[in-house]
Amino acid sequence: MSWQAYVDDHLMCDIEGHEDHRLTAAAIVGHDGSVWAQSATFPQFKPEEMNGIMTDFNEPGHLAPTGLHLGGTKYMVIQGEAGAVIRGKKGSGGITIKKTGQALVFGIYEEPVTPGQCNMVVEGLGDYLLEQGL
């Protein structure tokens, strides 16, 4: 399966039990900041934004004082899982980022999608990729 198929079929799909509820944007990005696959709606990000995200995975709490920035959008960092998941909130939407051995899985959402639904979709694919050694 191509990386784009993972984004299209596993991240940008209807959320289980909620037809027409799906993430706003999604991507799979290598630890080096190279985009493996992304939805058409995923924001263009700056290298320093990706560096900040990677630093937070290695030094949990790094982004808390400044917020998480992606594509010029600032998210307030909320409870995640140190070294494994970063979660952010902005207004009625937010972001979930799951770290795997080689990549970061991104999901961005707006209402009516809930934070829990975004977490389920992003972390589900991330856990699967970890099981595959990726």
Curated annotation (Swiss-Prot):
Is Endoplasmic reticulum a UniProt keyword of this protein?
no
Subcellular localization, as worded in the UniProt entry: Cytoplasm, Cytoskeleton
What UniProt keywords are attached to this protein's entry?
A: Actin-binding, Allergen, Cytoplasm, Cytoskeleton, Disulfide bond, Phosphoprotein
Q: Which InterPro entries match?
A: PFN, PFN_euk, PFN_sf, Profilin_CS
Entry GO CC: cell cortex; cytoskeleton
Any single GO molecular-function term of the entry would be: actin monomer binding
At what positions is Phosphothreonine found?
A: 114
The similarity comment for this entry is:
Belongs to the profilin family.
Q: What is this protein called in UniProt?
A: Profilin-4
Where does this protein come from, organism-wise?
Olea europaea (Common olive)
